[in-house]
């Protein structure tokens, strides 16, 4: 059961059967400049994402970033069949971004003896309302790349002026991301209800 649930993040870091592959190397993408991790910290709701085949069908997905000025961490959670499942990991600015000051960070999760790194690029954010994250992996065996993307919001619903801004931003990245393929998350009261919690990370998880 757990191996199936962990599939989501492992798949993003590697390659999944349901990935859509595009020929050639990852496109040249520029993350946001002057990225401010302190301002970015907080709870982000996953409004929508590009789908992965066979991934968990978690709802009410939230990524919470904490930063005390020196050390950062991430707490990802989602609800499946009344169970709140969560993953805790470390977060740091990507090595090259420490010099360029661009929006790239590394999340490290440990599933027993297995360590998985995920490197989201922040394509756009106003820090207070929305963020658009992006990840691209090149697969030498296929001579192709796969893309993942997420629309994040500090609130459970993306609406009004913020939604308009996000829609316009996605249009500027239409050469990278097919917005029509985004799958929306569910943050309804029913979807977010849970009666127990379960950790996916830790020394006894594999």
From Swiss-Prot:
Synthesized only in the caterpillars, apparently by the epidermis and secreted into the hemolymph. The protein is passed over from the larval hemolymph to that of pupae and adults and is sequestered in the eggs. The gene is INSB. Belongs to the calycin superfamily. Lipocalin family. Residues 1-17 form the signal peptide. This is Insecticyanin-B. The molecule consist primarily of eight antiparallel beta-pleated strands, which enclose a hydrophobic pocket, and an alpha-helix. GO terms for molecular function: pigment binding. One of its GO terms (cellular component) is extracellular region. Pfam families: Lipocalin (PF00061). The keyword Signal applies. GO terms for biological process: lipid metabolic process; response to reactive oxygen species. Coiled coil: none annotated. Homotetramer. Disulfide bonds join 26-136, 60-192. It is found in: Secreted. Keywords: Disulfide bond, Pigment, Secreted, Signal. This protein binds a chromophore: biliverdin IX, isomer gamma. Mixed with lipoprotein-bound carotenes, this blue protein provides hornworms with their green cryptic coloration which serves a camouflage. The keyword Disulfide bond applies.
